[in-house]
From Swiss-Prot, chains A, B, C, D:
Coiled coil: none
Active site per UniProt: 302, 373
CDD domains assigned: M20_Acy1_YhaA-like (cd08021)
Higher taxonomy: Archaea, Thermoproteota, Thermoprotei, Sulfolobales, Sulfolobaceae
Gene: cpsA2
Lineage top rank: taxon: Archaea
Entry EC no(s): 3.4.17.-
Job of this protein: Can release basic, acidic, aromatic, and, to a lesser extent, aliphatic amino acids.
Family according to the record: Belongs to the peptidase M20 family.
Gene Ontology terms, MF aspect: carboxypeptidase activity; hydrolase activity; metal ion binding; metallopeptidase activity
Protein name (database record): Thermostable carboxypeptidase 2
Pfam families the UniProt entry points to: M20_dimer, Peptidase_M20
Positions of Zn(2+) binding: 104, 109, 245
GO biological process terms held by the UniProt record: proteolysis
Length: 393, 393, 393, 393
């Protein structure tokens, strides 16, 4: 029996076990950095499988499991993120979140369950492994600021890793379909803050003021011009001004106006070109009117998630042995799996869960987000298959 | 001795008395509708002058004094507003405000003192009066919403009034200079609120949202086009967008965006044309993108302050007997003295207090606003002179 | 019989004569600098009245008549412009223009006829004149560039003039009503040209170009912001972008874009503030994108037309003896009578010709513009009356 | 010897012959629909090679050659376009264009030479062909309006064709590199014209006009918002406003304003969404101000060029046997080879000619565009190889 057949049979035995783990985590969602019970469940489950476990790797709730093969080989890391979102669950699944205002609305509960399933398969087929399989259970992917990957990497989680793989469940693709692409697959999220310092005054006498709202209008228009005119239109790219706040009263022109937003790009040149234009636009337009300004970009944001082309070609062939694999467009969301890919070649890929019949049609982050649990076994299978294949390269 | 000489002499006697009243009020500023101690001081002072006093006219802190001439004649109303502003005084006068965060930054303390000075002169020259002089001490001019004039009028303060006059101290004109104009002199302040209801979503996928901030940009640009293209450029007119609020997080496009501001005009046709355009702009631009919207104009705002042309011609001649009188440009601030002028012909005029030597250079509403007290006697004199002249018409 | 009664009777005798002169000129309209037959008619008519005539004063078609009083007195200049407009007349008067594409659409034919009528009255009442009455028949007011006034002034036409008056017929006011105002009455027309030099390229690859049209959009939006935010909203002021030209083909982004327009203001500070902002806006916004630019303002344009306040007060009283006189809003059109007013105190005023019953309802410069000829005698009368009164001051 | 080796040897023999043909055509460039001498040269050359020739296929200058295999098989079409551009050549090659203002600035001369080279190879290896190889020499690709492909198709050129291939030389890729991609590779060029009909008037009185330039500003801003906010930012997409014309004089607001430009997209849904928004934007914004408008999209423009995914996979493997093959980003230029791909599966691909050492660095359509002639044999080889492989499928 070939490897795929073997693993397919094995995963059938534990399908329900995987689902139950997922539901338990779904009922007890925990926000970024507070994944205490989830990480405890992971550590216990790994230990029950006889896997070497290290807790608190870089972060209190970070867990790493290690399965060593009987012969030398490559070190393959498999990653699952664990945190939930500040969303009030409105879907009516029986295992609905029991925590007010917190929900696994992005499927990280399924990621943990699928990787524990993969761990089970790997332990059961330990003889097929070479080198080391490193199971990374990462907190705080949704944090969007520092993020959980960075501290784990600083704590050495990627030392000696030859390949790294990560799966994300997504309602953008049909149930059971794997979707990925070579090169950049997810964007870097350059959060920005623009503050215009004008000089307030009476609403009836704008000429005696430096009107920060009017200036912000000109800046915002020019910023949207960056997308429409300055960036290569073939490049996936977007700037969104997502907050604007200024003023208190209808007859008082305020002193200051503040805008925040995000620049999403998949290319470092495009990224720096956009930021340069933004700085020039803000300072030049403020200069016209004698206003002063601040333009701040959040530092050390998640990098661009770049799939290694050769690895991706190979993985797509491997995965096509267990399901349909499609080449997807890039996504302008962001993922700190990108930091792992900066340390070792690997691939980040989506596992589709969209199933009209089962009502699994809502986008990730929606309060009605729901998952076709039939796909979970495929995730576990993919983890195990890649671990075995690449550890033996 | 002619009337002017007589009154000039009389006012010299009480100049210091007027100044002390002003300083007492300045030290104890009271916000709109809470002018308790100021109105008590007014009522007591009027009674000491033997003047018939009515308190609580339309508002608890409103005070009206009546001086009746010995022979029939016209009823002339003289008005002074009493409220202070939510401003922290930073000027270093010895009689600085003793109330944290409250200051007579618009000179209403001087208005009360000057009208009490005028009352003194009228009592002293009672024989020269015909008909009735009605002294209106009005709360809450700065309120900007309902305002104190309206309830006083509804309580009958303007019943039977033939002429009405009001003075406002202003650092826009040189000390002692009277400034006014025929026809519209101050604007109506149409406060507006625009709410754009879009559909929020992820900052990286604007195409899946109805972006209320982007829509508000287009609306704001078109609104400023009303001033630049749709309103007669000879007409004093301004629209100011003074607040804009939308969004909470750099990567989330919000559902809604809210803007507030003010339309200032001196002409009813211009006013309704501007409001029509604003409604059309907001609904049309929202319509392009499938957003819904609300456009609200505050109701029953202060009317346009319109000086009666004939009365103004006559008053300018009278005042030129006691000081320099200039014809001023209209001002796009607002005043609820306009409501009194809707009930009887009259005139609203400024008394200059700008004096570089004395450091009286800061604009009204400034935390450093200060008054050249030498002009106060002129205000009292003007009140008395107009009362006598017009009561005898 | 007083002066006004005398002149009223005299002008009745020549009313028809004035109307016939007007109609003759109306049938033979001549464009700026080409008023050959009109100026010939003027010279002949003056000579027939025994008036001393000088032709070619500064311009070939300029004519000056001089009537000297018997006793010393003031020199009073009265001015009428003579040129027509490049407009195809579509009104159906029997004395319609006989010249294709040229029409007296702004009433300069009536100005000539009224001043010749005034000359007749002055000759007839020569004894009432002191000093000298100087009749200025000026070419090329409509030229908008150099204009006819400047060369005539350089040729000495205003040497020794004490007062100068000019009438303009206008359908903005009711028939027979005089309208004027103290101070600035007409604007200075700062014509501007903005050229943005970008770098063209393919319409599908804007990022490889410096798109002059996009840049011009930002500039134009900011320019309209000058009106809405930077200039005192009480000041009559307008900027109009009246031409924009760029590009030849739908798939080629051009190199350059050119805009023209006009700034109209009644105040030198406002004027220079607007021009400064325009320069800063164009250079700053071009600077953002690496474009270069030119901002040119036409030189030596017609100045602001400023009526002398004292003279205006006096003239309004004089004119009220022959008709209704109203104080008008300023007009943002331009007039090179302004150059005469820079040389001597005087007044420029409108004579209304709007008459619904007679169908005289079209605005000046309209191809259907028509005049209520009953008012022409009033214009002649006004010229004579002012000449007599001010020459005797 | 395998097929590739055989063809490589054969093409060496005729490399110079191919280059000479190219240079002859380069010296005698002919604009769209006027490729008389080029098509004569093609017909003669084909006949000399013993190939069945048909001239005037749908267009006078269109030429089709047919090479029939000895055994049944597939019909494979190979296409080369023939027209030059209205560009004055400024490159200093010895075989520079001899026709003023006309130049082969896009390499269509090389396309003809490479396809004639391919024809030579196919005739020489006729025994390896099955079915039919149809050589399409197409006029007027650069025309951008109707284009040459459409009439040839209507004349039956694609009847019975099983596969179709087209090569385009491009300085965007290194010399000798083949570049292509599955799915959409070039855009559909929706040329648009927007006319705003307002109501002109005097530059000083915009409120009496419906200002078409101001309205066009609002429209243009909103149009660029389509790119920035309404279209999926991952989608290659651009709108360029490339011409704007309005107005004649600095003091006259014109009646009308006209804009032209192009929408480039690779997806029919995106394309129709953009056009819908454009219509809504123009009509809604015109509606605000009472202007009327026209929005016209050029009809029957070149479709999206869509490479058949399966054929592309196969071709990329075949071509990798003779040179480097890279997967390229889509290009937002347009090509009427797209019409051939609507009739039969096939692939359009680029052949790189960028060679710094040889100074071949200028973009297509540049007056300095020049080609590294060493690559021409590769193009001939590719034509022959694909014809043989796919005719035998």
């Amino acid at each position: 029996m070939d490897l795929v057949e073997k693993l397919k049979n094995d995963v059938k035995e534990i399908e329900d076990w995987i689902i139950q783990i997922r539901r338990k985590i779904h009922e007890n969602p925990e926000l970024s950095y507070k994944e205490y019970s989830t990480s405890k469940l992971v550590a216990e489950t790994l230990r029950k499988l006889g896997i070497e476990v290290e807790e608190g790797v870089g972060l209190p709730t970070a867990v790493v499991g290690k399965i060593r093969g009987n012969k030398p080989g490559k070190t393959v890391a498999l990653r699952a993120d664990m945190d939930a979102l500040p969303v009030e669950e409105t879907s009516d699944v029986e295992f609905k979140s029991k925590v007010k205002g917190v929900m696994h609305a992005c499927g990280h509960d399924t990621h943990v369950a699928m990787l524990l399933g993969g761990a089970y398969l790997l332990v059961k087929n330990k003889d097929l492994i070479s080198g080391e399989i490193r199971l990374i259970f990462q907190p705080a992917e949704e944090d969007g600021g520092l993020g959980g990957a960075k501290p784990m990497i600083e704590a050495g989680v990627m030392n000696g890793v030859d390949y790294v793989f990560g799966i994300h469940i997504s309602s953008s693709y049909p149930s059971g379909v794997f979707a990925t692409r070579k090169g950049p697959i997810m964007a870097t999220p350059d959060a920005f803050k623009i503050v215009v310092h004008g000089k307030g005054g009476h609403g009836s006498a704008p000429h005696e003021t430096i009107d920060p709202i009017f200036i912000s209008l000109q800046i915002a228009n020019a910023i949207y011009g960056i997308t429409a005119r300055q960036i290569d239109p073939v490049q996936p790219f977007v700037i969104s001004i997502t907050t604007i706040h200024s003023g208190t009263k209808d007859n008082i022109i305020p002193d200051d106006a503040e805008m925040q937003g995000t620049i999403r790009s998949l290319d470092e040149n495009v990224r720096s070109k956009a930021k340069d234009y933004m700085r020039r636009i803000v300072s030049s337009i403020c200069g016209i009117y004698g206003a002063t300004c601040e333009v701040k970009f959040m530092e050390d944001v998640y990098p661009i998630t770049v799939n290694n082309p050769e690895v991706t070609d190979e993985v797509m062939k491997i995965l096509s042995s267990i399901s349909t694999v499609v080449e997807t467009e890039p996504v302008l969301g962001a993922e700190d799996f990108s930091r792992f890919l900066q340390k070792a070649p690997g691939m980040y890929f989506f596992l589709g869960t969209r199933n009209e019949k089962k009502g699994c049609i809502y986008p990730n982050h929606s309060s009605k987000f729901c998952v076709d649990e039939d796909v979970l076994k495929l995730g576990a299978l993919a983890h195990a298959l890649l671990a075995i294949k690449f550890s033996n390269k």
